[in-house]
Every structure is written in structure tokens, then in C-alpha cells.
Amino acid sequence: MSTKSKIFLVLLVFCPLSFAAHWLGWGETTVFILAGLAIVPLAAFMGTATEEIAVVIGPNAGGLLNATFGNATELILAYIALKEGLIEVVKATLTGSIIGNLLLVMGFAVFLGGLRYKEQNFQPLAARLNASTMNLGVVAILLPTALQYTSTGVEETVLQNLSVAVAVVLIGVYLLSLVFSMGTHAYLYDVGVAENMEMPELGEDVSEPEPPTEEEKPNLWLWTGVLLVVTLGVAVESELLVGSLEVATESLGLTALFTGVIVLPIIGNAAEHATAVTVAMKDKMDLSMSVVMGSSLQIAFFVAPVLVIVGWAIGQPMDLNFNPFELVAVLVAVLIVNSISSDGTSNWLEGILLLATYAIVALAFFFHPTLV
């Protein structure tokens, strides 16, 4: 068992502790902290279970399962907050997840990987495609906000209808991107394969790699059960976290904006963060970039649109009119990541630049007076 798995197993102790804190009245702040720590290992085991099931059901269905459950923790947490009417916190969590993935996680991955390897390489074409797709995500959340701030008397129903329409477009693009990455152009996303293959002509079949030696497959029913249990655990812990959010943030002296943009995304993405950094330190920067960019794209093209549609359906209308300050931070993150990843190489100094940018953004949100 790896050291990372042992750490996550130890962190499971916070699950019963969070229940005890809730039922025994240890205080909302204690419940908030313990529930947040409990979500971290549950999210990790959700990812492990998804990967094990994917091995059994095959690459296509497995890829779709991974794509669906890739940000399940954030989706569950955001849905519960949305159900409680904390719409601005949900929006802040979405933008914070994108910012955290692009700056904090990629920063640590590039920095720590760069300390072990002088220069690391990754597929520049896939990076450019991801960057272009991310640009569309920025446009999708920028335009509804621009409509609100450049027009007078825009009714809430107009913004809601626009947001639902944009959400449908984004989900359509997300589905097509899955077809692209797992079907027509899968070779671009196969780590260690793309750089050794020539670009096929249109209509030309891409030869399949030699099948790996047959190994004993994981127990499908066991890992399905694990996935169901940890998903339920994430839902319960998210209820505790959201229920104590407002009182806890006030007692800790944090604004809801800072909590949504910085604190909650770190909790929800911690397991994914560990994966991206670990593989980067093994000189698998292609895989690390895939984890980071894939997670960010899922937030922008799947989680956010689904929440818009679900909010509309359950009577908690959420539009894509974001806090302008959040949009500036997302735009900064996307621009600097696009600049750094465009050449297909990375070094530790670029990691420092990403981490420094995240630190500045986090400080700006900490001192931002807006209470959402």
C-alpha cells in the first residue's frame, strides 16, 4: 500500500468525529473543520473506486465513468449548497475550483516535478487544444456577466434563460470533447503514445496498440459497493459542511467569498491534487497536465452547466452572472497557464510563477470586502 493511501486511510477517522461533533454539539466551527477533513479521503477513495471499475468495464465505458465521476465531490458539495440557497457560494466554489486547479495544483506539480527533473515535457498539441477549450469556458461565464453590467434593467428571468441556453451549449461541447478525446483523436491523449505517432490522415484508421498481458481484474461488485458507500459518505459530510458553513466562516473571520473561492475547492480537490503532483514527480507530466486540465474543463463544461439546469428545476435559479472579481481571477489563471503550457515543456521556475500567482489571488480574495 502506498504512503498516499495510508494517509487517506488515517484521515477516515474524521468521518465518525464529524458525526460526533454534530450530534454532541461541539460547535459549528468544529463540525465545519472535521467535515472538511473527512471529505478529503472519501473523495480519494471515490476516485480509486472509479478507476478500478473502469479497468473492468473497458476503456470506452471506463473513460466515460471517469469523466462523469471526475468532479463528483465538487458536484455533490455544490448541489447541497445550491439546495440550501447559497447560490453565490456555489458560484464562488466553481470559479475557485478552476483557479485552484490551474494555479495551485499545476503550480505544485510543475515545481516539485521540476526539482527532480531539470526539464519535463508534455504533449503541446493536447495542451493547446485544452487551452482553446478553456477559453470558450471563460467566454461562457463572461458574457452573461457582461450583459448584466453593460445593460440597464435586465430582468433576472432574462439572465436565467440565457444561462440555461449557454449551459445546454456547454454540455453539448463537453459531450463532443469526450468523443474527440476518447474516440476520433484518442491517440493525442494516450500518455507516451502521441509523441511517438505521426498525425493520421482524415479517414485513416489508427492502429490499436498491442494488448497488454492479461492480469487479474478488480472485483466489480466490491468496487461498485465502495463507490456507492463513499458517494453517500461525501453527500452526508457535505450536508454537515454546508450546514455549518455560515456560522463557521463568521467565527473564523473569513468572508463567504474567500471560503467559496479558496477553502472549499481545496477540500473538494485535495485527492486530485495529490494525484497530479505524485505523477509529475514520476516524470509523467502528460498525465499530470491531463488531470489538472481535465478537472478544470469538467468544472466549466459539465459541473457548472448541470448546476444551472438543476437549480432551475428545483426552484433555486442559478445563473452564470458571476462576481466580476472572480472572472478577473479566472481570466488571469487561464492566461498564465496558456502562456506556460504552450511550448510543451516545464521547469521549476514556471511552477513558482503559478504558485505566486495563486498566492496573490488568494490574498486578494482574503482582503476583498464583498460578502456573498
From Swiss-Prot:
The chain crosses the membrane at residues 7-27, 29-49, 62-82, 94-114, 134-154, 162-182, 222-242, 251-271, 294-314, 320-340, 352-372. GO terms for cellular component: plasma membrane. It comes from the Bacteria. Its main location: membrane. Disruption phenotype: Disruption causes the rapid degradation of pigments and salt-sensitive phenotype at alkaline pH. Optimum pH is 8.0. One of its GO terms (biological process) is calcium ion transmembrane transport. It is found in: Cell inner membrane. The lineage of its organism: Bacteria, Bacillati, Cyanobacteriota, Cyanophyceae, Synechococcales. It is a multi-pass membrane protein. GO terms for molecular function: calcium:proton antiporter activity. InterPro entries: CaH_exchang, CAX-like, NaCa_Exmemb, NCX_ion-bd_dom_sf. Ca(+)/H(+) antiporter that extrudes calcium in exchange for external protons. Plays an important role in salt tolerance. Does not transport sodium or lithium. Keywords: Antiport, Calcium, Calcium transport, Cell inner membrane, Cell membrane, Ion transport, Membrane, Transmembrane, Transmembrane helix, Transport. This is Ca(2+)/H(+) antiporter. Belongs to the Ca(2+):cation antiporter (CaCA) (TC 2.A.19) family. Cation/proton exchanger (CAX) subfamily.
